[in-house]
C-alpha cells in the first residue's frame, strides 16, 4: 500500500521563447512539512525553467483540490519585479499552501495542487496617472452617480483613459473621499477579526475570505466618508453602527451592490493610488 501523498503539477510557459513545459512531483501528506517541501519543489522547478535572474512579469493561476474540496479553489494573480521575479511570485503561493495544509477545520486529503505560470521579461505594468471627475460639480447628492475618468499609462507606452461609474452613499454627509488604487494597495483589513468581534468558524468561511483578497491586476475605485446617524428611519444609532461584526467578504459584497466600490480586472500589474475629496 502506498503512503498518502500530495500531488503537485507545474505548467510553465515562457512567453519570450514560446516554450511550454509541464512538471509533476509528490510530497508526503504531512500538514506541517508538506507545504515546505512542496514550495521548495515549486521554486526549484520554476527557477530551473526560467533560468534567469532579475526583472519580469508573471501571471499565476493556482488551484487547490481534494476529496472534500469537490469543486476545488482557484486564484489568478499577476506579479512584477524589477529585481527578483521568482521570489516575488512564490511568496503568495507559500502562504496559501500553508493555509490549506494547516487550516484548523479539516484535513484535505488527498490534496492536489496545480500551478500555471506564464512569464515574460516584458514589464506588463500600468500606472494610475490621473484621477478626474467628469462633469465636475461643487456639491453632490447622496445616492447620486459620479463618472470617474482614470488615466492609465502602460510601461513606456501612451496613456489611455478608463471611465468608471461610482455611487455616493445614500446617507453620506459633509465630505466624501474618492480613492482609486491598484489591487492590494491599502486593501481593507479584517477589522472584526482583529478586534475580536468575529471569528472564522468553518472552512467555507475561510475560503470565502481568501477568494475576496484583491489581486495585483485590479483597479479599485471606492468612495467613503461620514454618514448620517439616521438609519432606517431611526434617530439614534444602533450598536451595529458602532461595532461592525461583518467579515470583509460581507462588507465588500454590500459596497459593490450599492455601487460604492468598483473592481476592474486588467491584464497588467497595476501601480498607483490617487484621491479626491468631494462635498455632499
Regions found by a protein language model. Give the residues of each.
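C-terminal recognition in membrane/secretory proteostasis and scaffolding
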Residues: 1-280
Amino acid at each position: 500500500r502506498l503512503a498518502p501523498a500530495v500531488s503537485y503539477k507545474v505548467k510553465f510557459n515562457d512567453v519570450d521563447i514560446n516554450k511550454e513545459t509541464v512538471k509533476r512531483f509528490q510530497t508526503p501528506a504531512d500538514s506541517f512539512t508538506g507545504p515546505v517541501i512542496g514550495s521548495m519543489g515549486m521554486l526549484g522547478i520554476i527557477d530551473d525553467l526560467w533560468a534567469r535572474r532579475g526583472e519580469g512579469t508573471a501571471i499565476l493561476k493556482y488551484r487547490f483540490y481534494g476529496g472534500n474540496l469537490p469543486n476545488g479553489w482557484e486564484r489568478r494573480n499577476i506579479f512584477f519585479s524589477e529585481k527578483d521575479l521568482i521570489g516575488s511570485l512564490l511568496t503568495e503561493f507559500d502562504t496559501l499552501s500553508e493555509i490549506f495544509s494547516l487550516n484548523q477545520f479539516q484535513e484535505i486529503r488527498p490534496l492536489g495542487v496545480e500551478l500555471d505560470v506564464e512569464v515574460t521579461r516584458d514589464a506588463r505594468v500600468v500606472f494610475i496617472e490621473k484621477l478626474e471627475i467628469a462633469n465636475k460639480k461643487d456639491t453632490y447628492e447622496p445616492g447620486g452617480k459620479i463618472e470617474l475618468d482614470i488615466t492609465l499609462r502602460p510601461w513606456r507606452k501612451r496613456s489611455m483613459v478608463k471611465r468608471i461609474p461610482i455611487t455616493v452613499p445614500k446617507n453620506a454627509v459633509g465630505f466624501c473621499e474618492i480613492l482609486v488604487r491598484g489591487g492590494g494597495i491599502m486593501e481593507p483589513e479584517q477589522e472584526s477579526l482583529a478586534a475580536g468581534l468575529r471569528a472564522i468558524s468553518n472552512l467555507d468561511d475561510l475560503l470565502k475570505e481568501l477568494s475576496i483578497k484583491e489581486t495585483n491586476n485590479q483597479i479599485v475605485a471606492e468612495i467613503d466618508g461620514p454618514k448620517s446617524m439616521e438609519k432606517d428611519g431611526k434617530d439614534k444609532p444602533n450598536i451595529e453602527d458602532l461595532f461592525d461584526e461583518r467579515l470583509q467578504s460581507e462588507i465588500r459584497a454590500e459596497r459593490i451592490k450599492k455601487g460604492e466600490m468598483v473592481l476592474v480586472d486588467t491584464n497588467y500589474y497595476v501601480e498607483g493610488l490617487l484621491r479626491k475629496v468631494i462635498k455632499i
